């Protein structure tokens, strides 16, 4: 479970995410593909809209972080998409590293916000990995 403090901090970032979300996610993809070129294969065929789609997902997550049941359908859809693209648990730390670096570069928000986003990312990653494991095991 996420701490109340993390939830408060994440929710406080929603206005900044609405303003700079696509800039953050575009930078995250730049970092990810330059540091870990093999990850580009996971996004083969993804549209140019992918940074905007991810930004919208992050904004929704931050907005509903205190009511995650509101995102159950969206999280299930993301998990199915990840399985189609062959996303594995070992990819999550790479994305986390690049996302946190992008947040730091674009927003320069300070340690409290970065720590909260790290905790929130880990929580969501664990949820997705669990769902994806079930999907991968289905015939």
From Swiss-Prot:
Annotated CDD domains: FHb-globin (cd08922)
Species, as recorded: Aquifex aeolicus (strain VF5)
Gene3D superfamilies from the UniProt entry: Globins
Keywords for the protein's UniProt record, in alphabetical order: Heme, Iron, Metal-binding, Oxygen transport, Transport
One Pfam family, short name: Globin
Region forming the signal peptide: none
Domain Globin residues, every copy: 1-133
Sequence similarity: Belongs to the globin family.
This protein's name: Uncharacterized globin-like protein aq_211
Top-rank taxon, per record: Bacteria
GO molecular function: heme binding; metal ion binding; oxygen binding; oxygen carrier activity
